[in-house]
Amino acid sequence: MEMFQHILEQVKATAHTMQFYFQGEPLLNPQLPQMIALARQAGLYTIVSTNAQALSQEMAHLLIQSGLNRIIVSIDGFSQESYEAYRTGGSLQKALDGLRFLREAKRQYHSPIRIELQVLRLRTNEHEWHWIRRHYKAIGATHLVFKTAQLYDYEHGNPLMPTNERYSRYKRKADGTYVHKQHAPHHLSPCYRLWSGCVITTNGEVLPCCYDKEHLHTYGNITTQTLSQLFHSDKANTLRRHILLHPHHLPEMCNNCNH
């Protein structure tokens, strides 16, 4: 909590949004509702993304009472079989219960929170897309967002790839292998993430964006320098310059980015 308060004090005058998630599950942190409440008191828009496996009735009430603006609940299948195809060992019923708890708490406290159901487009759930479009509000969400899936093993295909390539981040080449789609030339549409925000890990490392999952491009640590110093550091500016000047030789972390 001390580190969070240290970060909040540095960003509250200039930041607009604070996202409470990266690689782990944010609801496992019992101090999360308190952290959100502090960010809201500082005037920040707050977002949490969760798989809802730890979204108990008590946690739902605490999140709503914290003033949370938006919660993303990821459910990638609507039978236990299709759900487990991507979220191995997860329980669909727990996720659906979590959505229901959020809806009930939202009504009880008359909260304007956006409850966003996020569904990855996968071959294992494509037969359910039409159903969820019709029923997402009935199961507790206020909004529905479909998202293409990031796959690490895609060069030779992947059983999770949707049948229709339109709904995939990857396209099949003439030789049968797959590449990531290029939505626009990088020199015409440069990355915006490196200029608009950053990721701060639980141990204080400052990363350029959420795609640096292996911490390969860390700017430094917020426990030894201010966030402003790190964000405008030589390391940060060198990375930005490289991405602008060498759009065809991007860092490995950029290969799976969909922006």
Regions found by a protein language model. Give the residues of each.
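Radical SAM enzyme [4Fe-4S]-AdoMet core and its adjacent flexible, acidic
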Residues: 42-45, 61-238, 245-246
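Conserved alpha-helical substructure of the radical SAM core
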Residues: 1-70, 81, 85, 93
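Cysteine-cluster motifs in flexible loop/terminal segments that predominantly coordinate metals
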Residues: 249-259
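Short, intrinsically disordered/low-complexity patches at protein termini
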Residues: 52-53, 231-233, 241-243, 254
